[in-house]
């Protein structure tokens, strides 16, 4: 018989902890000067904790490719530092993915504003 869940599931707690630690590591641990201001937005972890997809955004959109290279180059270092901070049976393999949800939201907001400006307000 399955136990009822209390509060957060373990996987959610692990995701939150990985996200916090990676955000700190990216902020303080990346020595590459090409790495701009990177924000870790979300982390998705597989059920067996073998893989973690890290969704991030950057302040300077022009440096998107460079930031991707920097993160890929630092992936092993970030994983080993994460292993020191989080006690898991297996530290997940990190996969970095640019989070386009913010851009999509801004584009959608701009479209709504455009339609609202074109349509006269009726009383």
UniProtKB/Swiss-Prot annotation:
Alphabetical list of InterPro entries matching this protein: KH_dom-like_a/b, RbfA, RbfA_dom_sf, Ribosome-bd_factorA_CS
Gene Ontology biological-process annotations: maturation of SSU-rRNA; ribosome biogenesis
Compartment(s) of residence: Cytoplasm
A molecular-function term among this protein's GO annotations: ribosomal small subunit binding
Disulfides per UniProt: none
Keyword Secreted in annotation: no
Keywords: Cytoplasm, Ribosome biogenesis
Subunit structure and binding partners: Monomer. Binds 30S ribosomal subunits, but not 50S ribosomal subunits or 70S ribosomes.
Function: One of several proteins that assist in the late maturation steps of the functional core of the 30S ribosomal subunit. Associates with free 30S ribosomal subunits (but not with 30S subunits that are part of 70S ribosomes or polysomes). Required for efficient processing of 16S rRNA. May interact with the 5'-terminal helix region of 16S rRNA.
Protein name: Ribosome-binding factor A
Organism: Neisseria meningitidis serogroup B (strain ATCC BAA-335 / MC58)
Recorded name of the encoding gene: rbfA
């Amino acid at each position: 018989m399955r136990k009822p869940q209390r509060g957060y599931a373990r996987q959610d707690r692990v995701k939150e902890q990985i996200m916090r630690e990676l955000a700190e590591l990216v902020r303080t641990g990346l020595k590459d000067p090409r790495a701009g201001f990177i924000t870790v937005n979300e982390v998705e972890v597989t059920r067996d904790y073998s893989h973690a997809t890290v969704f991030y955004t950057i302040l300077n959109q022009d440096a998107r490719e460079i930031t991707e290279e920097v993160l890929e180059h630092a992936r092993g270092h970030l994983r080993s530092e994460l292993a020191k901070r989080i006690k898991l049976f297996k530290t997940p393999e990190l996969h970095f993915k640019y989070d386009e949800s913010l851009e999509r939201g801004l584009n959608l907001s701009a479209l709504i504003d455009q339609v609202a400006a074109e349509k006269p307000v009726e009383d």
